[in-house]
Amino acid sequence: MVKSLMIQGTSSGAGKTILVTALCRIFSDMGYTVSPFKAQNMSNFSYIGKNFEISRAQAIQAVGARTEITPLQNPILLKPLGNYRSSVFVDGKFFKKMYASDYYENFVLKDGLKKSMNSFKKLSESHEIVFLEGAGSPAEINLQKYDITNMKMAKKTAVSYTHLTLPTKA
């Protein structure tokens, strides 16, 4: 069974991304197969791979983990366009442009959560440790109903809330 740990913070810019990057490198140095994971990221800074596009943050974390950069690590990328509209990328491919209301009401809890869980499951089958990164703050009450990146993902993946117990390496 994969071990997973989620890093959440009090706000955007709190240091979650750099902490996950560091943890990926530390545990990779210890000999574990490690992958980062962020269910949904909103950023115009992207990494363009061979036939896919994900958040640059998860690509850098994958480099830290010494693992292949893959759309599984960031199944949903939102690239803001302004006026509450974003280009939505799913599984590394452009899906469509959506207004926030359409995204929240018609996509995120239906298809978005399912896609994210499938990606996490695939990563967990090929890695010993998956570090999940939250987004912004899990305490933003105006977004909690639709927030798949923080507590919904923590509950669905049964991440460790207090500590990570690892098997010893021979």
Indicate where each model-derived feature is located.
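Flexible phosphate-sensing "switch/lid" loops adjacent to ATP/NTP-binding sites
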Residues: V2-A14, I18-L164
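A short, hydrophobic C-terminal helix/tail in secreted or cell-surface proteins
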Residues: T165-A170
